Amino acid sequence: MQRPDMSVAVAGIKMRNPVMTASGTFGYGAEFADYLDLECIGAMISKGLSLKPKAGNPTPRIVETPGGMLNAIGLQNVGIDAFIEQKLPYLKNVNTPVIVNLYGNTLEEYGEVAARLDGLSGVAGIEVNISCPNVKQGGIVFGTDPGAAQEVVRLVKKNTTKPMIVKLSPNVTDVVLMAKACADAGADALSLINTLTGMAIDLERRRPVLANVTGGLSGPAIKPVALRMVWQVAKAVKLPLIGIGGIMNGRDALEFMLAGATAVQVGTASFLDPSAAQRIAREMEQYLVDHKIESVSSLIGALEL
């Protein structure tokens, strides 16, 4: 058979294959150019960008755990203006869609960052991180309150013409409720899941390992949770989904597609193997060849119950 068709599209963003890089694990893209061919992956997602530069949390802020890692980086980034001036020019010369992940500490910040990206060439879409505390509302996380999440999504939608992916938090009682709220507010696609909140303790020192005390758990340990949430949301919402959580190889990625994801994001795997995203895309294609499957899109939601 001829080579299988690996192309997919998420909210109008056409990709050569379903493998995207997860925000916060791939720098701004250029940092990984020596380790893999940036034009062999589906899309690149930037570090989370805020209105102003952010220094992040004190160290230590990363710790390995059984089956994964905890991070409390604190959304360190150069700020939206520096990204546009210093990082985006390089990315414009790469023939791979660039999606900008953005966040805010207030509703207004989300809207302002989205507005600054609107109309820019070289940005195929935006991913909205709603797992941030609303400093004007006592620190409640936008992504754990359906009403607050809808406010963010509506404002970003108002301020941009670019496709909008909303990244869902798993730290909720009902992820389907959050997914429906974001869909109703105008999300064009959903990515899930973000990290699970966890902590690590140093027994000898009787202190938390992370300076921030808690952090976000990622890696293979969260994959079963992520698969379950993707499957649940796929049954409830008619939007393209991007699966995230513990994807280390091509088989992992294809499992997410069976559960209902159109594409996947590779995150923690890139810390262990900087070329992971390209390798996973290659492994997915080889699986299709071995099983005589003509198109990867035929696997989306093809789970048999």
From Swiss-Prot:
<dbReference type="InterPro" id="IPR001295">
    <property type="entry name" value="Dihydroorotate_DH_CS"/>
</dbReference>
<feature type="binding site">
    <location>
        <begin position="71"/>
        <end position="75"/>
    </location>
    <ligand>
        <name>substrate</name>
    </ligand>
</feature>
<protein>
    <recommendedName>
        <fullName>Dihydroorotate dehydrogenase B (NAD(+)), catalytic subunit</fullName>
        <ecNumber>1.3.1.14</ecNumber>
    </recommendedName>
</protein>
<keyword id="KW-0560">Oxidoreductase</keyword>
<comment type="function">
    <text>Catalyzes the conversion of dihydroorotate to orotate with NAD(+) as electron acceptor.</text>
</comment>
<keyword id="KW-0520">NAD</keyword>
<comment type="similarity">
    <text>Belongs to the dihydroorotate dehydrogenase family. Type 1 subfamily.</text>
</comment>
<feature type="binding site">
    <location>
        <position position="167"/>
    </location>
    <ligand>
        <name>FMN</name>
    </ligand>
</feature>
<feature type="binding site">
    <location>
        <position position="219"/>
    </location>
    <ligand>
        <name>FMN</name>
    </ligand>
</feature>
<dbReference type="InterPro" id="IPR050074">
    <property type="entry name" value="DHO_dehydrogenase"/>
</dbReference>
<feature type="binding site">
    <location>
        <position position="23"/>
    </location>
    <ligand>
        <name>FMN</name>
    </ligand>
</feature>
<dbReference type="GO" id="GO:0044205">
    <property type="term" value="P:'de novo' UMP biosynthetic process"/>
</dbReference>
<keyword id="KW-0285">Flavoprotein</keyword>
<feature type="active site" description="Nucleophile">
    <location>
        <position position="132"/>
    </location>
</feature>
<dbReference type="InterPro" id="IPR024920">
    <property type="entry name" value="Dihydroorotate_DH_1"/>
</dbReference>
<comment type="subunit">
    <text>Heterotetramer of 2 PyrK and 2 PyrD type B subunits.</text>
</comment>
<dbReference type="Pfam" id="PF01180">
    <property type="entry name" value="DHO_dh"/>
</dbReference>
<feature type="binding site">
    <location>
        <position position="129"/>
    </location>
    <ligand>
        <name>FMN</name>
    </ligand>
</feature>
<dbReference type="InterPro" id="IPR012135">
    <property type="entry name" value="Dihydroorotate_DH_1_2"/>
</dbReference>
<dbReference type="GO" id="GO:0006207">
    <property type="term" value="P:'de novo' pyrimidine nucleobase biosynthetic process"/>
</dbReference>
<dbReference type="GO" id="GO:0004589">
    <property type="term" value="F:dihydroorotate dehydrogenase (NAD+) activity"/>
</dbReference>
<dbReference type="InterPro" id="IPR033888">
    <property type="entry name" value="DHOD_1B"/>
</dbReference>
<dbReference type="GO" id="GO:0005737">
    <property type="term" value="C:cytoplasm"/>
</dbReference>
<feature type="binding site">
    <location>
        <position position="193"/>
    </location>
    <ligand>
        <name>FMN</name>
    </ligand>
</feature>
<feature type="binding site">
    <location>
        <begin position="194"/>
        <end position="195"/>
    </location>
    <ligand>
        <name>substrate</name>
    </ligand>
</feature>
<feature type="binding site">
    <location>
        <begin position="47"/>
        <end position="48"/>
    </location>
    <ligand>
        <name>FMN</name>
    </ligand>
</feature>
<comment type="pathway">
    <text>Pyrimidine metabolism; UMP biosynthesis via de novo pathway; orotate from (S)-dihydroorotate (NAD(+) route): step 1/1.</text>
</comment>
<dbReference type="InterPro" id="IPR049622">
    <property type="entry name" value="Dihydroorotate_DH_I"/>
</dbReference>
<dbReference type="InterPro" id="IPR005720">
    <property type="entry name" value="Dihydroorotate_DH_cat"/>
</dbReference>
<feature type="binding site">
    <location>
        <position position="101"/>
    </location>
    <ligand>
        <name>FMN</name>
    </ligand>
</feature>
<feature type="binding site">
    <location>
        <position position="47"/>
    </location>
    <ligand>
        <name>substrate</name>
    </ligand>
</feature>
<feature type="binding site">
    <location>
        <begin position="267"/>
        <end position="268"/>
    </location>
    <ligand>
        <name>FMN</name>
    </ligand>
</feature>
<dbReference type="InterPro" id="IPR013785">
    <property type="entry name" value="Aldolase_TIM"/>
</dbReference>
<keyword id="KW-0963">Cytoplasm</keyword>
<feature type="binding site">
    <location>
        <begin position="245"/>
        <end position="246"/>
    </location>
    <ligand>
        <name>FMN</name>
    </ligand>
</feature>
<keyword id="KW-0288">FMN</keyword>
<keyword id="KW-0665">Pyrimidine biosynthesis</keyword>
<feature type="binding site">
    <location>
        <position position="129"/>
    </location>
    <ligand>
        <name>substrate</name>
    </ligand>
</feature>
